[in-house]
Each structure stands twice: as structure tokens, then as C-alpha cells.
Amino acid sequence: MKILHTADWHVGKVLKNQPRIDEQKLVLRDLVRVANDEDVDLVVVAGDLFETAAPNPQAQALVMHTLMALREGNRQVVALAGNHDNQKLVQEVYAPVLGQLGIHVIGTPRRPDSGGTLTLDTRTGERAIVAALPFLSHRYAVRAAEALLHDQSQHNQDYANKMRGIIELLCRGFTADSVNLVTTHATLLGGRWGGGERAVQTLLGYEVPPDVFPASTHYAALGHLHRYQEIGGPCPIAYSGSPIALDFGEEANQPVALIVHATPDSRAHIRPVPLTGGRSLATLRGTLDEVVAAGAEAGEAFLRVILTQKASAGLADQVREKLPNTLDVQIDEKFRARTDSTVTRSRIGRTPTDLFADFLAEREVEDPRLGAMFAELLEDST
């Protein structure tokens, strides 16, 4: 069986006021091309279809059309909700509508007999059993454990054990003569965030160990971390990463789709296939003259410029005039006057999440976990 694994599309992403939708149209068109060229039997989209919980019509249309294009040729398609997605919208609107076209969409955790475990017969006659678990926050993990496991004693266990129990339940239908797959949107211990090579450290107990996946799993298709990577465990495990570099912390990432070959009696083989269409990102650091000189080598990349000189009137405008692809101009902290704060951005029309992202960017904090934590705390408080 040939499987295409992708995740973290984040359709509707806006980077420093620059919409990425045109790039996303190109890269998702390329993703469909890969599915066709590779003649895959099954496509798995492991969460974060959208950038926000309230995607605009253009973003929704792109996701819908891409999923339908992937379905062409009678290939099976499975798509999950991630932490950026509106899970109720995905479950109550997209799942029934796209389900009429044979596309399997899972927005909220389901019991095995209600869509949590899918038995899919491919066009080649092979059978896949897919245990599908959308993103689970702490507060929903307790609720999901109660609904799926019917065990009140589970409520006091930590997040990882709740995930383990739910995944074990969803995998009970695995058989010896099927290709057994797990797909979820989660953070595994040992994974690396898209913005650097740091080992993921425990943060609010969200990480789960790779051994939550049973050894009978032929392949675990993950979403949430934006860098392509394989994780050691009892079965082949991989993150496909995002098909475009979403932020400047991810500028070194190489966008790919994963082609996975799996049979009931062999270990899955994973092969990354490069995706095109997204513009690269680059950070230039130096004086005005230095970054302008370096910009000649940056091509069409979107730029973040960090100036190692004192601020002066019109400096940012000079940068943008000489480097039109510049999205962000900062003064290196060493050159900022003690009384000088970073440029105040207008709050009109900007969400608290946007303002917090600006706050992190101004301090060169590149850790997507903080943004996710802020968004969850904001949701809990409103």
C-alpha cells in the first residue's frame, strides 16, 4: 500500500501582514500532483488544516478543493482537526459534507465504532485500518477519556496516560492481514520544533512518549511539529512537517510530503518528496549596508531584517525601499536605547493572539509552544 502523509497546512496563514494564501494554493496543487504522480492509495492529513478557528471563505475553499482533488481516482482520504482548527466546525460541517464524497474527516475524538477507527478498502484491494485521534487539549482529554474509556479512575491520570488509553482503544481493531495506521496531532517526546534543533522538553505535560503506539502499528502519521522528522519507537513514526515555512523560526525547514510504503507483513518505508510553491524565509543581520548587500543573495525570499545599529528616522523605510521583500525590521537589542521601546503597532483590528505573537517576535522568542499556551489560556478565560 502506498500512503501520502501530510499535515500542518495552516491555510489562511498571514505572516507579518503578508497573506500566504497564494503560496498555499501553489504548494497544495503540488501536493495533489505528488499524489497523482506517485499513484498513492491513501492520503492522511494529520491536523491543522487551517491557521485559525475562523477561517475566511478563501481558506475554506482551498482546503475543500484540495481534499476533493486528493480524493480523485477513488483514493482514500483521511483528515484530522489540529489545535489550530475549530474542531466542532470540522466535525459538524466538514465531516458530513465531505463524507458524502467519501472523504473521512474527524474533528473530535470518536469511539472506534463512530469514526475513531476506520476500515478502508483501497482501490487495489488492500485493507487499511486507521486509528484517528484529533488534537486533545488537557481540558478535553479528561472529557474524551470519560466518553471513550468509561472509566472514572482514568481522570486523575496525566495527559500522556489518557492519550495512551485512548490510542490503545482505537487500535484494538488492528488485524494481522491489514495495514494498521495511527494518525494523531500531538507532541512526542524526542521531537524537534520547526524553529530549531532543541529536544522538546516537557511543557504543561503535553508530550507523550512514542511507546503509546502499539507494536502492531505499521506506521504512525503525526502532525503538530512543523519539521519533517522520524521518531524512534515500537513502530515507524514520522512528522511530515508543514508544506511551507510558516514563520521565520522555520526558515531552515525543507517542505516535503511523505510517501510511505507499507504491507501487512513488512516494516513501513518512508520517503520524503520535496514540495514546491512556498517562498523561502530568511533573516538578515547587520548594518543597513550589510543587509542590503546580503539581500542580493536572498532571491525571492521573504525577509526579516535585524539591524545592528541605532534606530533613526526612516530607517525601516530605507530597508523596505532597498529590500522590497522585507516583512519585518527590528533593531538588535544591543543597539536599542534603554528608554526606547519597540515600534508600537496599532491595536485596531488585531486579536490578543496577534499582539502576543508581536510581543514574542520583538523579543526574538521563537517557541511556538508559548503561542499555543496563550491561545488556550485566552480561550479558557473568554
Indicate residue ranges for each PLM-predicted region.
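Accessory, non-catalytic peripheral segments of nucleic-acid enzymes
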Residues: 37, 42, 261-382
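Binuclear metal-dependent phosphoesterase catalytic core
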Residues: 116-128, 133, 235-299
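Active-site neighborhood of phospho(di)ester-bond hydrolases with catalytic His/Asp-centered motifs
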Residues: 6-7, 43-48, 76-83, 104-109, ...
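Conserved beta-sheet core of the metallophosphoesterase superfamily
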Residues: 99, 188-266
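N-terminal active-site segment of His-dependent metallophosphoesterases
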Residues: 1-68, 72-75, 372, 376-382
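Conserved catalytic scaffold of divalent metal-dependent phosphoesterases
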Residues: 96, 100-203, 263, 274
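Metal-dependent catalytic neighborhoods of phosphoester/phosphodiester hydrolases
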Residues: 14-16, 49-66, 81-101, 106-107, ...
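Active-site neighborhood of divalent metal-dependent phosphoester/pyrophosphate hydrolases
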Residues: 10, 40-58, 75-89, 188-204
